[in-house]
Amino acid sequence: MLKLWKVVRPARQLELHRLILLLIAFSLGSMGFLAYYVSTSPKAKEPLPLPLGDCSSSGAAGGPGPVRPPVPPRPPRPPETARTEPVVLVFVESAYSQLGQEIVAILESSRFRYSTELAPGRGDMPTLTDHTRGRYVLVIYENLLKYVNLDAWSRELLDRYCVEYGVGIIGFFRAHEHSLLSAQLKGFPLFLHSNLGLRDYQVNPTAPLLHLTRPSRLEPGPLPGDDWTIFQSNHRTYEPVLLGSLRPAEPPVPGPVARRARLPTVVQDLGVHDGIQRVLFGHGLSFWLHKLVFRDAGGYLTGKGLLWDLDRYILVDIDDIFVGKEGTRMKVADVEALLTTQNKLRTLVPNFTFNLGFSGKFYHTGTEEEDAGDDMLLNHRREFWWFPHMWSHMQPHLFHNRSVLADQMRLNKQFALEHGIPTDLGYAVAPHHSGVYPIHTQLYEAWKSVWGIQVTSTEEYPHLRPARYRRGFIHNGIMVLPRQTCGLFTHTIFYNEYPGGSRELDRSIRGGELFLTVLLNPISIFMTHLSNYGNDRLGLYTFESLVRFLQCWTSLRLQTLPPVPLGRKYFDLFPQERSPLWQNPCDDKRHKDIWSKEKTCDRLPKFLIVGPQKTGTTAIHFFLSLHPAVTSSFPSPSTFEEIQFFNGPNYHKGIDWYMDFFPVPSNASTDFLFEKSATYFDSEVVPRRGAALLPRAKIITVLTNPADRAYSWYQHQRAHGDPVALNYTFYQVITASSQDPPALRSLQNRCLVPGYYSTHLQRWLTYYPSGQLLIVDGQELRTNPAASMEIIQKFLGITPFLNYTRTLRFDEDKGFWCQGLEGGKTRCLGKSKGRKYPDMDAESRLFLTDFFRNHNLELSKLLSRLGQPVPSWLREELQHSSSG
């Protein structure tokens, strides 16, 4: 019996183990099936979010307030913009203060020029005038108390400037825990009550500064924070702009003020008290309505000089039509809702039309219901605008062959023709903005040949973030407009699952980022996706709510234009953006990800020889090319061997064209690529363009006596048969007057202007740090080139070090230094170099010595500040000037 039990017991244990394993397997299978069912089954739909309703005036909802009939005093004259630069002076507490950054962000978004200064202490007020012209059109104080408590000398200086030039002041009072609860503002008939909790905000409809702001609505509910300041005054110079009420738990404000009274948190000083107009804020810019009024304040105080008109153009793109996985696409009901909302929006925004971007390959790749939605879109195709993506939604930068890229486009065009989709809008968008910026030349060429594209848009120029820096440009005849995001992406399809919660989306619409995008940009192209119009239809919710909110709170005139007229409108407003500013794609990870892997930033030069002309730059180019670690650009067949990329029409050909002039270095860390274009030095645009594309490049310039340089250029032009140089003496050229022929004045400028050395160097130093700039003594280069080349090699950090004392040899016949060869032979520059000219006449020498005296003095001061040695020729000129 015992033996039998020993046999049966293990068998029962084995069966128990098997049963447990089967139960575990069954549980896992059930969980997997449930997960699959949940993921593939349609979600139980919650009610769709309803857009913001119509505005309703709530002025009667609050109690009495201090809003009184506007006083018609004599207002101070508007800013004399003809006598002031359109620059805003912003006094900040620190470079990192939050309010200061918010002020700057709004100015930058509005494309206004500004200068920030740390709020001065005693006697360090920045210079406010330049001769008889004011430097600033508006003054902003992040901390109003810094203005009020200025020392007497600085305060009088600033106030006198504001009165004389009609300049206004915006100031912010931010209460903190140590602020007095009640106090009079020093020197003003104005009382402040601080650290209050407020509610129920309202706009005073009689405030003179209102332009963008529409005073038709009360904002109910508590205002954020408990650190609000309200203003009180009986003086007629103060007009309330924004008003709120005390929260029930707040103690009453001193004075005869009703409990439910409207209390001013923003006041406008009409200038009756002291002749200076001001707008004072009792809080920062964290509350959205303050941003709106801040823009109005800046516009009013500058006579609308810092204010766009009320027109705002919006275009809503719906990318990825027919693209998307099952369960995220539009169904028939969604298309019907799209049409209904479009019609509603047209009553609010003239000509509003959704702009649909399609990839035909994915037509009918959804569920049966979603395929019916595709058909519904095509049935109503004439009611929308349409633009092409790529046929297979591929990124264009992956196509290196233009014909293959064009074939993909033709497939999409054939699909459009077969289904009656209009193809004449002249607009296209590349998937993921690939190839638009950084430029993929093949994309632009294929777009033009297949579709006749005239305009596109991208969020990547010059960078994705911050969005306020996005700009437009024109390349290869195609207008590239800035594109904006609206917080809706392919994965944001459910209201209650919005990242950060649905309140984040509503906050963006109601005074947040999306609202400010339209407020601060005359033209906004918004990117949305097909999936945003299925499911919870967040695209419809967002834009209907946005439009209604804008019309509640602003006087903006919302409009829609087709892409090509919209592009023309954009560049009419911002003609300065027509020319692009190329940047290094490898300095931005997003740019590198959408840039062809066949391209490399290693082909960009490490240093530039920038001129000026006739100073010895060709000799340096020749000498450097003898170094085994240094490689020059290939010669250009069209611009006298120099590339001349940064200062002429070649710049618009793009960086692919530029990089084709350089080989791929065998070792990017030790090989030095460079180019020499002597016309770069005195160009107004080259330093900015160069620093954008080559921010770490070293810059080499060669300076000789500017009088000798001018004479050399004149003789150079005579040698090349310039009729002006042949028909006029050098003295006639350099002394030409404004009444002389334009051709003569042009030659005069090319002789004289490059010699304004300090002016041009200051421009370079605006964009490059002084440590990246080397100034070579042109006279020493001529007499002792080996010493100059030693300095240049050390500056560039080139290894191995080449001994130019052994490499170079003076050629008596040529009269300058050449490469020494075996057998006593030399290899020299071409016949055009080293020409012998007659000596300059004494009259011209005397004139030029006097003409360049101040320029040379400024150059000496600049070199002293930079810690760079003074060239031998400059010392001689300064000694000669002082002795004369």
Swiss-Prot record:
GO terms for biological process: heparan sulfate proteoglycan biosynthetic process; heparin proteoglycan biosynthetic process. The active site is at K614 (for sulfotransferase activity). The chain crosses the membrane at residues 19-39. Residues 1-18 are cytoplasmic. Keywords: Disulfide bond, Glycoprotein, Golgi apparatus, Hydrolase, Membrane, Multifunctional enzyme, Signal-anchor, Transferase, Transmembrane, Transmembrane helix. It is found in: Golgi apparatus membrane. It comes from Bos taurus. The keyword Ubl conjugation does not apply. The presence of 4 different heparan sulfate N-deacetylase/N-sulfotransferase enzymes in mammals, as well as differences in their enzyme activity suggest that some initiate heparan sulfate modification/sulfation reactions, whereas other later on fill in or extend already modified heparan sulfate sequences. Residues 599-884 are annotated as: Heparan sulfate N-sulfotransferase 2. Essential bifunctional enzyme that catalyzes both the N-deacetylation and the N-sulfation of glucosamine (GlcNAc) of the glycosaminoglycan in heparan sulfate. Modifies the GlcNAc-GlcA disaccharide repeating sugar backbone to make N-sulfated heparosan, a prerequisite substrate for later modifications in heparin biosynthesis. Plays a role in determining the extent and pattern of sulfation of heparan sulfate. Required for the exosomal release of SDCBP, CD63 and syndecan. Residues 41-598 are annotated as: Heparan sulfate N-deacetylase 2. One of its GO terms (cellular component) is Golgi apparatus. Monomer. Disulfide bonds join C818-C828. One of its GO terms (molecular function) is hydrolase activity. This is Bifunctional heparan sulfate N-deacetylase/N-sulfotransferase 2. It comes from the Eukaryota. Belongs to the sulfotransferase 1 family. NDST subfamily. Its EC number is 2.8.2.8, 3.-.-.-, 2.8.2.-. Its main location: Golgi. Residues 66-79 have a biased composition (Pro residues).
